[in-house]
Each structure stands twice: as C-alpha cells, then as structure tokens.
Amino acid sequence: MSKEKFERTKPHVNVGTIGHVDHGKTTLTAAITTVLAKHYGGAARAFDQIDNAPEEKARGITINTSHVEYDTPTRHYAHVDCPGHADYVKNMITGAAQMDGAILVVAATDGPMPQTREHILLGRQVGVPYIIVFLNKCDMVDDEELLELVEMEVRELLSQYDFPGDDTPIVRGSALQALNGVAEWEEKILELAGHLDTYIPEPERAIDQPFLLPIEDVFSISGRGTVVTGRVERGIIRTGDEVEIVGIKDTAKTTVTGVEMFRKLLDEGRAGENIGALLRGTKREEIERGQVLAKPGSITPHTDFESEVYVLSKDEGGRHTPFFKGYRPQFYFRTTDVTGTIELPEGVEMVMPGDNIKMTVSLIHPIAMDQGLRFAIREGGRTVGAGVVAKIIK
C-alpha cells in the first residue's frame, strides 16, 4: 500500500494531444502509455481503447473524449485525446479538459495542415500555456533536409500565434514504431516525457491562487447580518479577511466576520468547499447572485471582450437557424445570465449551428472576469453556445 500512497503525492499535470486529423494523435497517446508503463510502471492503454472515446457532457454539449493517465518518475499526468476535430474545438472552448500544456502532433510526411494551425490558434485563444511538438512518422522520411524544413514551418506557425516557436521543444519520432516496441523509437517517447517534465511548469493549485467565491445566494440573518453562499473557486478565506464584492454594481469592500459550513462555524473556507460567509456592515440588497467575493485587487469587472465561441448544432439541442449581427442572447457567467450584444469578424454575415467563431461581446452589466473565463450563451434558459474570454477590451 505504501507505493499507492507515495504516488498520490506526485504533482498532477493535465496535458493532451492536439493536431491535424490522421497525424497520429491517438497512436501517440497509446505509445506514451505503453512505453512509460514499461519503464516507470502504470497501465498501458491500447489504441482501440483510446479511439472509441466515451461521450461526456460539458455545459450541455456532447463531447467524445478519452482520458488516460501515466507517470514519469517525478509527475503524474492526466492526458486527454479526442477522436474528431469537432470534439477538440468543443473541448478546448468549454474547458471540459483543462490543459496545463499540449502535445502538438505533426506528421513529418505532411507538415503543418489546416487543423494544425486551427488547434494552435485555439490554444492561444483559450489559454493553453505551453505546447511541445512531436514530429510523427519520421521513420517514413529519410531526408534530413525535409525534416528540418517541416520543423522550421512548425516553429514559424507557433511564433505567428505568440508561442515561443524558436524555443519550443520538438521531438522527432514514430508513435507507431514506439508502440511496436522498437527501441530507438521508444527512446523518443522517453525524450518527449522528459520535455513534459521540464518544459511545462508545475501548475499552481487552486488553493494557492487568490481567493474567489461566485455568489449563489444572499440572505440576512437577524442580529448577525448578511450571509452569502457559494462554492469557493480558488484560494482560502479566513475570518477577519478583507474582501471585495465585484461585478454588476460598483465594486465594494467589506470584511468576512465568519465562515460557516453545514451550519458550523469554521476558521476558514478552502477551494472546492461550499460555504457561507458572513459580511460586516453589508445590506442584503447591496449584493446579488452573479457577483463574486474576491481578494481585493485580484479581479476586475468588465463588459467588453473578445471571445472564442462554439455554437451548438441542432442535434445538440442548439438553434435550428443561424444568427446574425445584432444578435442579443444572454451570457451565463458562473451563476448568472447577463444580456449582451455581439460583433462578428469582418466579412462574416451569419453564424450557423455547429460553427466555432471569434466574436466580440458587449454586456449590459460588468462581470468579474479574467482571460480564460468560460461562459455559456443562452436563449430563455436554453444553452445554445459555449465560449471563453480570449481578451478583455474594457
């Protein structure tokens, strides 16, 4: 049992494979689990186990995703792989599988293709912080100059979307040969694992980030004051801490005079816990659902932002018809809907169900937001799209 216990103390990092269709993402995923299991222990996963990915729902959207796990000597990885291009788009936009870093798979036989570019762009828009490149099918290319050319193209493409193309690790390998147990190609998988360990920094745990609690409910308790309830999204809140109430109205400061959970008084509330926070000198009507409690100065309210959006298809329960500029749906952030207007990119007249699109949104009330915040687009309580804040305008 002692081994199991030790495993859990390793840092946990979320990664995934991205790249063009048929460039070998799933084969590479299988190869990583197989080679690392052989060298460092753990469970190997066969190609077909990964390829028939189970359906899951994220924000009402059906996504096919495979989750595998593997270990290196220093870390534990959770790795996500999607069978289809549409699944990647949905996955990255909804944040169903948050990635601390991605492995971009490019076939050396093809070089960068349209989805290579699209996945890099999506990675930039949704805030995937690090990309490592696996140049696949190198066993089928014996021309060194060609490999160098493909490598150069990939680096240029990464730089175009503000990733550090010149410094990005690129591994030349063959996922299939590694999966088949050929030693020289297995080495390349170990080399890739080494880059995962060193190039992707250890993610900051939610509990170490600045305190944030999306407010779900507000009520007043006679003789004690106003209590807000919700689930702590990140950080820790302690009795006596000063906090800001951010969003919808002007930002206000107050002090937390008590933290309670299941009607018991605590000293603190931590990320992941459902708590009630008693606020000093704050009236019930000054606060509403949709605002957040936050560490002072850690988050600001905004109305205008650029976003990357996936519009649900009719089959997913989305709209049956396209929408045009001047569309005014509700944008659901954390716990509340806010009406907003949209601007479409130049030359785009309409958006069809099933499309993914970049759009600029202007909300009628400010919402506490930072880059990477996820939201749903709703019409009368029905989800018709999912999006992520790519850039704050004002």
UniProtKB/Swiss-Prot annotation:
SUPFAM superfamilies: EF-Tu/eEF-1alpha/eIF2-gamma C-terminal domain, P-loop containing nucleoside triphosphate hydrolases, Translation proteins
UniProt-annotated stretches for the region G1: 19-26
Record domain tr-type G: where: 10-204
Entry keyword annotation includes Metal-binding: yes
Reactions it catalyzes: GTP + H2O = GDP + phosphate + H(+)
EC numbers on record: 3.6.5.3
Keyword terms: Cytoplasm, Elongation factor, GTP-binding, Hydrolase, Magnesium, Metal-binding, Nucleotide-binding, Protein biosynthesis
NCBIfam families: EF-Tu (TIGR00485), PRK00049.1 (NF000766), PRK12735.1 (NF009372), PRK12736.1 (NF009373), small_GTP (TIGR00231)
Species this protein is from: Haemophilus influenzae (strain 86-028NP)
Protein name: Elongation factor Tu 1
Location of the region described as G5 in the Swiss-Prot/TrEMBL record: 174-176
Highest rank taxon of the organism: Bacteria
Residues binding Mg(2+): 26
G4: annotated segments: 136-139
Residue positions binding GTP: 19-26, 81-85, 136-139
Entry's Gene Ontology molecular function annotations: GTP binding; GTPase activity; guanosine tetraphosphate binding; translation elongation factor activity
Subunit structure and binding partners: Monomer.
Region (G3): 81-84
